[in-house]
Every structure is written in structure tokens, then in C-alpha cells.
From Swiss-Prot:
Cofactor list: Zn(2+)
GO molecular function: alanine-tRNA ligase activity; aminoacyl-tRNA deacylase activity; ATP binding; tRNA binding; zinc ion binding
Comment on bound cofactor: Binds 1 zinc ion per subunit.
Name of encoding gene: alaS
Free-text comment on this protein's domains from its UniProt entry: Consists of three domains; the N-terminal catalytic domain, the editing domain and the C-terminal C-Ala domain. The editing domain removes incorrectly charged amino acids, while the C-Ala domain, along with tRNA(Ala), serves as a bridge to cooperatively bring together the editing and aminoacylation centers thus stimulating deacylation of misacylated tRNAs.
Primary role: Catalyzes the attachment of alanine to tRNA(Ala) in a two-step reaction: alanine is first activated by ATP to form Ala-AMP and then transferred to the acceptor end of tRNA(Ala). Also edits incorrectly charged Ser-tRNA(Ala) and Gly-tRNA(Ala) via its editing domain.
Entry's EC annotation: 6.1.1.7
Protein name: Alanine--tRNA ligase
GO cellular component: cytosol
Length: 877
């Protein structure tokens, strides 16, 4: 049974059982700083299980793409070497949110495996939590599983929790028995680490809430979370013991083999590298599709590590030219129908992989040469020095796990203590991963409130002032009954017109006025999605829970923010029209002062393109069409062509913002009523923020007018300095720059002539030290280039001498040292130049016979030169 058919059969089976198909979420978890990547099928439903989000269905089924590379779950180093380790995989899962429980889910799982897929019951082995008599009874007495094929296991294997506190419960796992010809015992036995029994499905029963003391309280509405790896199930149904022998990987392995000219199965090393490429092209392609690009930190660094590991294995297969991007097309052919977003992003993925591989290959050979030299004489079991590991990472871009991969092949170990020490000495640690649970702890009070309070009613689309009731107050991270004058705190209302920061739009500011108090709102946030929190300060009086307040948004700021937000939609559409449909929004910020828009594009936007973008956006503004908003089913909105932002999570119904025929996007932000309200659009800057990601900053309305007037003032001032009319400024500036270049050339010639004259006269001033001519001199008004010219002249006159020249120009010191080749065993030019530079706060280096340095503090130069003279005498004496 092919993987595509397995995936479809799973989804269809659970639809028949009343489940709603939920499309796969991106690999980037939304609003969850605790996770680097989506690593399980339940991640998109985490807020539902926590009670922070409601869905219009209580039963769900999905085929969720997942990543395990970086962070707590990291399978990268084992990928290619084992039968079942992957960076990217698909998790089939069915979920119940307070609907069915153990009896139903166990029955669903058993019938799907044995009836729909036809697996022999005698090939399945069951585990339950050692204290879960209910699940054991269902398996044995209702399903009819032989007690001899059921194991009771401890908390480590069969009790699941979301964290130290919160929802948790026992789980039951289903294993497949591959047969006695494969070593290994059943789960729970001393031989369980063998490969005979392979877990294929985990059924998690969320029935408890664990508090900080460890006490378990039964949940009023228990839920179910299940997960089954498609790759493992495909191996079972296709009669193979290795996931890489399934149809999920075989076409990719065949494509990699064709590109490299190798044959899969010819030898172990070749097979490992081909499996690495097949796995890594899946991970890299979906990461880029989901908005991640190679970078030096966070998720982008994980992607970079995976790409570079793939390139290294490609090189092992003899691929000496850029190749990795050629595997995208075979992947799209296999998975594009199940994940159409991959098909849409194919060209962008190919470009990103090609750029990154080209960049890495520039240093790959040099890095490998350094490593080969370092390990050439190491015996098996020896350690690669930490200094080498660090230098490979810092200078040649070798992720540490890539070096570890090579160490594994050579039967070497890694000196990680030495690596850490080298990194500390350099004070330039490699990028750290995202994460940490501290952010979650700081929001615990929000979490508790979200569990108790209803959804905040937001009225801000239709009004900027409304009445609301104070339902919670927070000060210093704790719930309080009141806030007094001078207190900084947080106010939560049952209804509010204040927009909470989301979708790139800044939160509203304004004030809350009760009969007895005035609270100035400086920001509005939505930390738990549906809970609006107003941050600010009590200006007067005392604000208490239960008080009624008039919530008034700062309308001037709101209008400016709305103008910037609507302009962002116009900018997005203009970019796609002018640069191409590959442009995708990668981030944005809109507030009253400006807009910032990040988007995918492989190269800087030219000045001509920026002018055209600005012209197109302003033309749309002048057309003054209305900005229409509608609530539609998500499928209908997408059918109409509304752009969805990748990575955003949408419900069954979405808000569509349409601006004539120019732009239509899914958006929950506030907008102008008509495009003419934007006024004018002015681009301030265009820059790069990461590989393949560009940023445009712009302003609208009154802020744009101020920017235009500032530019005009600068133009007038510059014209005044050059004593010309503004219209003639460019011509006069070109003339002035040309004259400046001529003067600089003349000055360089004067300096060279002076250096020649200085060199000619200085040779006679050399001091004899033990038969060696030594010349150490300070020269005023000479820069580094002039010093080099002087040194060249002097070395021709004193070929067996020691020379140090110091040039002083505009409070900067340039230093150069030359040592005759026959003297470098006694005097090293690099050490010599540093004896002068270091007392001046500088540093230099170079070859034994020639070195340079730069420094400041010319007042201390004479003393430093005298010290250098004594140092040379000590070396030659």
C-alpha cells in the first residue's frame, strides 16, 4: 500500500467516525516560544487542550508535518545511519476535545489497523500504563487482545505530560512485530531495545491536571491525542524493515543516485549518504516553504546545519558542483499533491538551496583540508582538538554536528570541553537556539485568567469608545483586587474597543475612565489569543475589579495605524506585481509612526523598482476605492483568491479585507474606510535582514509629508553649501567629487614622493646591533600606504636589517615592521609590531618577515618605540 493511499485511508476512516479534517499546520509553531519546530501532531491543538481556544468541532484528524532537529528533540546526528531516524516526518493523528475517550479511541485504532489496513492481530503488541486497569481491561476483554501480547510499563514509557504542570495522563502504545528473524524482545522486556517490535501508534489519554505540587486532579472533560508516524506505518504495509525502503524515500534516493552516478546498495557509506540526502531534502524544502531561510541563529541556523550536512554528504558521493536544489523537483512530484504549498514554493525553495550551497562550497574545501590535516595522525578513539572544532565553525562555517559526523566516520571523539573553552576565549559563541520555558512562566497568570474568563468581546472594528467592566487586575505579575494612583499594571475588561497587538499591528493606546479613576493605556496585548490586556498606569484615583469604565482609544493614533496597515496590503500587492509572485510576506510591523514590511526576494530591490512600487501604491491610493471587510468561510475566501499569510492559524471563518481589484487578504487588523484616507505613501528605506529576506520601511499621511519636507530641507541645505540651485545640485556634486578624486591622487603622489625621500635618507640612520642594522623611526603625516612604500625602499637598502616605521596621521598610528629573512628565527615581525601596537591599544599581525598594525594614542608612541628598540636588542644581543 503506497504512502499516499495510507494517508488518504487514515483521513477518510476518521471522517467516517465523525472527525473534521484539519490541514497540516506549518513547521513553525504559532505563538509558542517554547518550541523550535512543530514536533508532534498535537502541537497545533495545544491551546485547545489547554482550554485557551475553542474550535467548532470536537473531533479532529490530521496528517501533520513535523521536524525533530535542534532543541530537545534532535535526531540529526543519527539520520542516514539508522532505519527510522528522520529530521522531517508526517504524524497521522486523531483527536478528541472532551468528546470520546479510551473505549472509543482504542476501538478506532484497532479496527483501522486490522480491518481497514488488514494487519494480522497476532502481529500487534500493546502496552498500557502500569496503573491503567481501565485501558488494559478494554484491550483484553473488549477488543480481545491476548494477555500474552500486552505489557504494563512504567511512567517513563507510558505516562504523557505537556509540561511540569497542566494536562497529562496515561498512554497506550501499539507495536508491530516484524518477526523472530529480527533480534529484540517485546516492549517492557530486557531485550526491548532490539528492532523486532516497532512502535507505530501512541494513544494518549489526557485525563488529569497536574499542579505544582504534583497532585493529579481528574479533568471534567478528558481528551485524546494520538500519533502514528506515516513512515513507520508505510514500512509495515510495504513489507520492509527500513523506512528508507518505502515509496516515501525510494524516489528521492533514486534521484540522488542518478545525480551522483552512484548505486544504492553498493556499499554502506554510499547508502548512508544517499539516505541523508533523501531525508534532508524533505526537511529543508518544507522549512523554506514554511518561511525559514538559512541564518546564523534560531530556526534558520538549524536549516543551515541540515543543508551543510547534505552538501558534505553530496561531496562524499563525488558531487563537486552545486546539486542539492536538483532534488526539489522529485520531492514535489512525490508530495506536492498532499501539500500544494510545497508546489507553489518550489522555485523559491530551489533558489534558497542553490544560494546556500554556493556560499558554503566557497569554504568547504579549505575547512575539510584543515580537518584532514588535524586528524591525519589521530588513532581510532582519539579526540579531535576543541580548537580545531571551534575554528571550523567560526571561520569555515562548519556546524559542530557536521564535524561530529566526520568524527563518527573516522571512529574519533570530539573534545567538546576544548571547544567550549575556545569559544569562551574568543567571546563569540555560536548562535543559540530559540526557546526556554521562562517566557511561559511569566505568562502563567495570563494562562490562569484565560482558563477562567470568557473571550474578551472586541468592539473596535466599529467604534473607538465603549463601556466595559473590569474583570481582572494585575500588578507585578500577580492578580490584585485594585490599582491605585501611580501603579503600573494590567487591566482586563469583559469588552473593549482596544485592538490587541497581533498580525504585525501594534496594540492601541488611550485611556480607561471610571467614576473614581483614570488609567492611561500605553499598549494592548493578546497574550492568550482571545484575552485582551491593557497595559499602563493609574493616573488618578483607585481602579477596582467590578468597576465600569469608558474605554477610549486614541483615535489619532488608531487612524495613523490603520493607514499604515492598509498601505502594507497595497505594498504587498505592488511587490508581487512588480517583482514577481514568489514574493511572500515574512513579517510586518504597523504602528502610528511607520510601517515595516519583510518579504522574500533573492536580491536587493533596485532604485528604479522602488520608484515604480511607490508610484503604483500612490496610484491605488488616489483611486480612493473603499476598503471592504467581510467574514467568510476560509475555503470560500481562498477560492476567491484572498492571500493567506503563511504560518498564521485561521479558524473556519476568516475576515477578508478587499481593496478593489488591487488587493485581497485574510486580515484581522484595522483599516481605512477608503484608500484615499491613506493620503500619500513614501518609502524610507530598503535593506536586507537575512539571506533571501528584504525589508521596506515606509510612512503614510502626515508622517509621509514630514519625511518629504525633511528631504526637501536637506536638499536645500546641500544646494546652499555648494552655492547652486537645487535643480543643479547633482551636476555640481559630480564636479566636486571629480575634483576631490583628482586632489586625492595628487596627495597620494606627494606622499609617495615623500616616502621615497624619507626612505633614501633614513637608511644611513640605522643603528648597528650585534652586526645587524636596526632602524626604528616615527614619521609624521604618513598613512599605511606611504609607510609600505618607504619600507620597500628601506628593505632594498637594508636587506638583512630590522625595520620598524610608525606613521602618525589625524590621531591614528600606522605601524609596519620588516625583518630580513635570515633573521626571522631570532626576530618575528608580527611579535615586533605588536610590542609597539599593544601599549597603544592596538593589535596587528603578519608573516615572520613582514607585519602591520594599527593603533591610537600617538602621545604614547615614542615610549612604545623605545621599548621596541630594547626588545630588539634583547633578541639580537
Amino acid at each position: 500500500m503506497q504512502a499516499q493511499a495510507i494517508r488518504q485511508a487514515f483521513l477518510e476512516y476518521f471522517v467516517e467516525q465523525g472527525h473534521q479534517i484539519v490541514p497540516s499546520s506549518p513547521l513553525i509553531p504559532r505563538n509558542d516560544p517554547t518550541l523550535l519546530f512543530t514536533n508532534a501532531g498535537m502541537v497545533p491543538f495545544k491551546d485547545v487542550f489547554l482550554g485557551l481556544e475553542t474550535r467548532p468541532y470536537r473531533r479532529a484528524v490530521s496528517s501533520q508535518r513535523c521536524m525533530r532537529a535542534g532543541g530537545k528533540h534532535n535526531d540529526l546526528e543519527n539520520v542516514g545511519y539508522t532505519a527510522r531516524h528522520h529530521t522531517f516526518f508526517e504524524m497521522l493523528g486523531n483527536f478528541s476535545f472532551g468528546d470520546y475517550f479510551k473505549r472509543e479511541v482504542i476501538g478506532f485504532a484497532w479496527r483501522f489497523l486490522t480491518e481497514r489496513l488488514g494487519l494480522p492481530p497476532e502481529k500487534l503488541w500493546i502496552t498500557v500504563y502500569e496503573e491503567d486497569d481501565e485501558a488494559a481491561d478494554i484491550w483484553m476483554n473488549e477488543i480481545g487482545v491476548d494477555p500474552a501480547r500486552l505489557s504494563r510499563c512504567g511512567e517513563k514509557d507510558n505516562f504523557w505530560s505537556m509540561g511540569d504542570t497542566g494536562p497529562c495522563g496515561p498512554c497506550s502504545e501499539i507495536f508491530y512485530d516484524h518477526g523472530p528473524h529480527i533480534p529484540g524482545g517485546p516492549p517492557g522486556s530486557p531485550e526491548e531495545d532490539g528492532d523486532r517490535y516497532i512502535e507505530i501508534w501512541n494513544l494518549v489519554f489526557m485525563q488529569f491536571d497536574r499542579d505544582s505540587s504534583g497532585t493529579l486532579t481528574p479533568l471534567p472533560k478528558p481528551s485524546v491525542d494520538t500519533g502514528m508516524g506515516l513512515e513507520r506505518l508505510a514500512a509495515v504495509l510495504q513489507g520492509v524493515h527500513n523506512n528508507y525502503d518505502t515509496d516515501l524515500f525510494k524516489p528521492l534516493i533514486a534521484a540522488a543516485a542518478a545525480i551522483s552516478g552512484k548505486t544504492y546498495g553498493s556499499d554502506a557509506a554510499t547508502d548512508i549518504s544517499l539516505r541523508v540526502l533523501a531525508d534532508h531534502i524533505r526537511a529543508c524544502s518544507f522549512l523554506i516553504t514554511d518561511g525559514v531561510l538559512p541564518a546564523n541563529e534560531g530556526r534558520g541556523y538549524v536549516l543551515r546545519r541540515i543543508i551543510r550536512r547534505a552538501v558534505r554528504h553530496g561531496r562524499k558521493l563525488g558531487m563537486e558542483t552545486v546539486f542539492f536544489h536538483q532534488l526539489v523537483a522529485p520531492l514535489v512530484a512525490e508530495m506536492g499533491s498532499a501539500f500544494p504549498e510545497l508546489t507553489r514554493a518550489q522555485r523559491e525553495v530551489e533558489r534558497a538551496l542553490e544560494r546556500e550551497e554556493t556560499r558554503f562550497r566557497e569554504t568547504l574545501e579549505r575547512g575539510l583540508s584543515l580537518l584532514e590535516e588535524a586528524i591525519a595522525d589521530l588513532a581510532a578513539g582519539a579526540a579531535i582538538p576543541g580548537e580545531i572544532i571551534f575554528r571550523l565553525a567560526d571561520t569555515f562555517g562548519f556546524p559542530v554536528d557536521l564535524t561530529a559526523d566526520i568524527a563518527r566516520e573516522r571512529d574519533l571523539i570530539m573534545d567538546m570541553e576544548g571547544y567550549e573553552a575556545a569559544m569562551a576565549d574568543e567571546r563569540s559563541p555560536l548562535p543559540c537556539r530559540l526557546g526556554g520555558s521562562g517566557e511561559v512562566k511569566t505568562e502563567r497568570v495570563y494562562h490562569d485568567l484565560a482558563m477562567r474568563l470568557p473571550v474578551t468581546e472586541f468592539t473596535g472594528y466599529s467604534t473607538c469608545a465603549d463601556e466595559g467592566k473590569v474583570v481582572a487586575l494585575i500588578r507585578d505579575g500577580e492578580e490584585v483586587a485594585f490599582l491605585e494612583a501611580g501603579d503600573m499594571g494590567v487591566v482586563i475588561l469583559d469588552r473593549t474597543p482596544f485592538y490587541g497587538e497581533s498580525g504585525g499591528q501594534a496594540g492601541d493606546r488611550g485611556e480607561l475612565q471610571s467614576n473614581d479613576a483614570l488609567f492611561a493605556v500605553t499598549d494592548t496585548q493578546k497574550p492568550m489569543g482571545h484575552l485582551h490586556v491593557h497595559l499602563g498606569r493609574v493616573e488618578s484615583g483607585r481602579l477596582q475589579i467590578g468597576d465600569m469604565v469608558v474605554a477610549s482609544v486614541d483615535e489619532v493614533a488608531r487612524r495613523a495605524t490603520a493607514a499604515h496597515h492598509s498601505a502594507t496590503h497595497l505594498l504587498h500587492a505592488a511587490l508581487r506585481n512588480i517583482l514577481g509572485s514568489h514574493v511572500q510576506q515574512k513579517g510586518s510591523l504597523v504602528n502610528p509612526e511607520r510601517l515595516r514590511f519583510d518579504f522574500s526576494h533573492p536580491e536587493p530591490v533596485t532604485a528604479a523598482q522602488l520608484r515604480e512600487i511607490e508610484r503604483v501604491v500612490n496610484a491605488a491610493i488616489r483611486n480612493n476605492v473603499g476598503a471592504e471587510t467581510r467574514i467568510l468561510p476560509v475555503a470560500e475566501a481562498q477560492a476567491l483568491g484572498a492571500m493567506a499569510l503563511f504560518g498564521e492559524k485561521y479558524g473556519d471563518e476568516v475576515r477578508v479585507v478587499r481593496m478593489g481589484d488591487f488587493s485581497m487578504e485574510l486580515c484581522g487588523g484595522t483599516h481605512v474606510e477608503a484608500l484615499g484616507d491613506i493620503g500619500v505613501f513614501k518609502i524610507l528605506s530598503e535593506s536586507g535582514v537575512a539571506a533571501g529576506i528584504r525589508r521596506i520601511e515606509a510612512v503614510t499621511g502626515a508622517v509621509a509629508l514630514e519625511a518629504i519636507q525633511r528631504d526637501e530641507e536637506r536638499l536645500q541645505a546641500a544646494a546652499g553649501l555648494l552655492k547652486v540651485a537645487p535643480a543643479e545640485l547633482d551636476q555640481r556634486l559630480a564636479q566636486t567629487l571629480e575634483r576631490l578624486r583628482q586632489l586625492e591622487k595628487e596627495l597620494e603622489k606627494v606622499k609617495r614622493d615623500e616616502a621615497v625621500r624619507a626612505g633614501a635618507g633614513l637608511a644611513a640612520e640605522a643603528e648597528d646591533v650585534g652586526g645587524v642594522p636596526v632602524l626604528i623611526r616615527r614619521l609624521e603625516g604618513m598613512d599605511g600606504k606611504a609607510l609600505r612604500d618607504a619600507l620597500d625602499r628601506l628593505r632594498s637598502q637594508l636587506p638583512d636589517g630590522v625595520i620598524v616605521l610608525a606613521g602618525v596621521e589625524r590621531e591614528k598610528v600606522a605601524l609596519i615592521a620588516g625583518v630580513g629573512k635570515g633573521l626571522t628565527g631570532r626576530v618575528h615581525a608580527g611579535e615586533l609590531v605588536n610590542t609597539v601596537a599593544q601599549p597603544l591599544g592596538g593589535k596587528g599581525g603578519g608573516r615572520p618577515e613582514l607585519a602591520q598594525a594599527g593603533a591610537g594614542n600617538p602621545a604614547a608612541l615614542d615610549a612604545a618605540l623605545n621599548a621596541a628598540r630594547d626588545w630588539v636588542k634583547g633578541k639580537l644581543g
